């Protein structure tokens, strides 16, 4: 205790533990708090029809979401997904420039995926790196074009990112109304909210359901941000 008192004089706050295994939990909590303002936006879209037949309406939603996240003080991480990445970047830069801020990796971190068959083995590492830097993962759309069958299919990469984000204890925010894989993820979580979130109550349940409601762009973004806000005061957290 005398040694602990000496540490406090140097503004070092010691933490007592009962068991060595608690160190892992403490480190996880430190990492969560460090990353809680970092948002990973997972999305790809060859088409947007399950959300809107108007492509511009879809890209406007993505841009506005990105802009509002920056406004709220969040930092954005993006893998530059097809049909989504450019809109994410545009929305973020628009807000950063409006506030005369400098662009850096803290506010906007981009990790474009290397293309070509030889690079596909690296994609898993790319995903893990991005998600490890985030505290929140938002899932939108999630489809791609299958040239072999000449059709639009669900994006398996988004499913992998969902699984990784869950393992990393990210706050999972599936915007189900955008359709495709994002809707599949919303459905999976909706079946058992307590598997992904703690202290599930009526407020959280209603907020989660709103992520699947089609509405005006501004209202949808409000629904997304309101859901995230529920986890800010510590009442709710992502489930371990």
Model regions: which residues?
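Acidic/glycine-enriched connector segments
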Residues: 1, 47-238
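Domain-level recognition of nuclease-like catalytic cores that cleave nucleotide substrates
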Residues: 1-17
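A generic structural signal for short, non-catalytic loop/turn and secondary-structure boundary residues
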Residues: 7-9, 34, 103
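C-terminal, charge/polar-rich interaction regions
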Residues: 10, 239-240
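Alpha-helix C-cap/termination motif
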Residues: 10, 32-33, 133, 168
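Short, structured interface segments
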Residues: 12-34
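Short, surface-exposed amphipathic charged segments that create phosphate/polyanion-binding patches used
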Residues: 27-35, 121-128
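Short, hydrophobic/glycine-enriched beta-strand segments
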Residues: 35-46
């Amino acid at each position: 205790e005398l040694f602990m008192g000496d540490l406090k004089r140097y503004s070092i706050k010691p933490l007592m533990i009962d068991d060595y295994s608690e160190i892992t939990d403490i480190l996880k909590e430190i990492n969560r708090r460090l990353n809680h303002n970092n948002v990973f936006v997972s999305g790809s879209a060859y088409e947007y029809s399950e959300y809107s037949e108007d492509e511009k309406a879809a890209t406007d939603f993505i841009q506005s979401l990105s802009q509002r996240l920056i406004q709220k003080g969040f930092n954005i991480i993006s893998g530059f997904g097809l049909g989504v990445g450019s809109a994410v970047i545009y929305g973020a830069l628009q807000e950063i420039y409006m506030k005369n801020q400098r662009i850096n990796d803290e506010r906007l971190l981009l990790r474009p995926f290397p293309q070509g068959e030889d690079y596909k083995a690296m994609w898993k590492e790319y995903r893990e790196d991005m998600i490890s830097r985030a505290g929140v993962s938002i899932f939108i759309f999630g489809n791609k074009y299958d040239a072999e069958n000449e059709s639009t299919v669900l994006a398996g990469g988004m499913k992998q990112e969902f699984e990784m984000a869950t393992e990393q204890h990210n706050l999972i925010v599936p915007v189900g109304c955008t359709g495709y894989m994002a809707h599949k993820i919303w459905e999976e979580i909706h079946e058992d909210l307590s598997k992904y979130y703690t202290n599930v109550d009526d407020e959280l349940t209603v907020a989660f359901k709103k992520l699947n409601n089609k509405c005006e762009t501004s209202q949808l973004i409000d629904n997304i941000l309101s859901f995230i806000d529920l986890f800010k005061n510590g009442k709710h957290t992502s489930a371990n």
